[in-house]
């Protein structure tokens, strides 16, 4: 590969630091950039949770210093608020369960950052995602199935992938950490972030309550129609949720209850048995799907979930998906990504599901 001018997105974690290091090793002209995405005072606390804290910015700068590359911080907080946070709140308010990491990749890392990078004369953007990218732009799973991130990249458009580089796709997480230690990077043992980066407390329900205020309503049994209790905000629930329903009494048959449906218009949360969560078909919107005719493939509906055989048919700007096996606890708003083996075929956002 010829020498390129490369922008390395550095989150302050071990993956992005090693990805930047490998770009340097490849002979590219590398500049590091950290994205300032949050203006919450909680993100500036030492030990704050998430992935865009002041401590993360410092870790990214230290890694850039070790690598001997220029380093900058880009303030994208306003666009992140509009494109990711506002939509996250709107989705929960509408009874959907969003994946903000997917949205961030679509609208921030491979849109806002990519646009600015190309305008500044960079040839590509390097990130620490665990995924592989063929020379023809085909996205594939990482060799490390436990850390594979192709799912959160599966709705990127071909033109976005064309300017992306994922140097870690052929390495396991253990190998990445070992390499970071050999290179003297202080983030070698830094824990992975598992929280929603802009919810510093880690309590999504409480965070939404601050934004949306109380919206009380009933918790209703799907089988009997009985009102079992009250809640102060349907947005604090997700389809498939079992704990924290606040019912105070078990079902007559002793079976646990799960959230089956959220109705924002009436602020009603409907609960019932786990069997009612099984869905065998779905409709996807906001699709990336460059294929004709029905396609037999596998579908993944969770970032760390398994795949199920599926037949996908394009109908205008939506996809009709028939599943060979039921998926349980899947909600509208989640991403669905389709695979042929380890090759990503495309994806979209789930609009609706049916049994």
Swiss-Prot record:
UniProt cross-references to PANTHER family, sorted A to Z: MITOCHONDRIAL TRNA-SPECIFIC 2-THIOURIDYLASE 1 (PTHR11933:SF5), TRNA 5-METHYLAMINOMETHYL-2-THIOURIDYLATE -METHYLTRANSFERASE (PTHR11933)
EC number, as in UniProt: 2.8.1.13
Function, as annotated: Catalyzes the 2-thiolation of uridine at the wobble position (U34) of tRNA, leading to the formation of s(2)U34.
Family: Belongs to the MnmA/TRMU family.
Positions of the record's site feature: Interaction with tRNA: 129, 334
Identification of the protein by name: tRNA-specific 2-thiouridylase MnmA
InterPro entries: MnmA-like, MnmA-like_C, MnmA-like_central, MnmA-like_central_sf, Rossmann-like_a/b/a_fold
A single Gene Ontology CC term: cytoplasm
Active site, UniProt feature: 104 (nucleophile), 197 (cysteine persulfide intermediate)
Residues annotated as binding ATP: 9-16, 35, 128
GO biological process terms on file: tRNA wobble position uridine thiolation
Positions of the UniProt region annotated as Interaction with tRNA: 147-149
Keyword field: ATP-binding, Cytoplasm, Disulfide bond, Nucleotide-binding, RNA-binding, Transferase, tRNA processing, tRNA-binding
UniProt xrefs under Gene3D superfamilies: Adenine nucleotide alpha hydrolases-like domains (2.30.30.280), HUPs (3.40.50.620), Translation factors (2.40.30.10)
GO molecular function: ATP binding; tRNA binding; tRNA-uridine 2-sulfurtransferase activity
Disulfide bonds: 104-197
Enzyme class name: transferase
Main location (coarse class): cytoplasm
Subcellular location: Cytoplasm
């Amino acid at each position: 590969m010829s020498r390129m001018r490369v922008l390395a997105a550095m989150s302050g974690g071990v993956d992005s630091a090693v990805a930047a290091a490998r770009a340097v090793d490849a002979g590219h002209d590398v500049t590091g950039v950290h994205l300032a995405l949050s203006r919450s005072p909680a993100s500036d606390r030492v030990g704050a949770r998430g992935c865009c804290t002041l401590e993360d910015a410092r870790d990214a700068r230290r890694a850039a210093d070790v690598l001997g590359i220029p380093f900058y911080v880009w303030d994208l907080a306003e666009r992140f608020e509009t494109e990711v946070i506002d939509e996250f709140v709107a989705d929960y308010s509408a009874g959907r369960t969003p994946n903000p990491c997917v949205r961030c990749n679509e609208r921030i890392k491979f849109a806002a950052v990519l646009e600015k990078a190309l305008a500044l004369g960079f040839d590509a953007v390097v990130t620490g995602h665990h995924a592989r990218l063929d020379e023809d732009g085909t996205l594939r799973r990482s060799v490390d199935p436990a850390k594979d991130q192709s799912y959160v990249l599966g709705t990127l458009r071909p033109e976005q992938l064309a300017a992306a580089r994922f140097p870690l796709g052929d390495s396991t997480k253990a190998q990445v950490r070992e390499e970071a230690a050999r290179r003297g990077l202080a983030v070698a043992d830094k824990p992975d972030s598992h929280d929603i980066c802009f919810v510093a407390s880690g309590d999504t329900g409480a965070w939404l309550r601050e934004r949306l205020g109380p919206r009380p309503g009933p918790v209703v049994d799907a089988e009997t129609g009985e009102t079992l209790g009250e809640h102060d905000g349907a947005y604090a629930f997700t389809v498939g949720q079992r704990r924290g329903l606040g019912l105070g009494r078990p079902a007559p048959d002793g079976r646990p209850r799960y959230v089956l449906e959220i109705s924002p218009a009436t602020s009603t949360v409907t609960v019932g048995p786990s069997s009612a969560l099984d869905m065998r078909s779905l409709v996807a919107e906001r699709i990336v799907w460059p294929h004709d005719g029905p396609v037999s493939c596998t579908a993944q509906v969770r970032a760390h979930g398994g795949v199920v055989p599926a037949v996908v048919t394009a109908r205008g700007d939506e996809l009709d998906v028939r599943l060979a096996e039921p998926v349980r606890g899947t909600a509208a708003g989640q991403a669905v990504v389709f695979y042929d083996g380890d090759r990503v075929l495309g994806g979209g956002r789930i609009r609706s599901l049916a049994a």
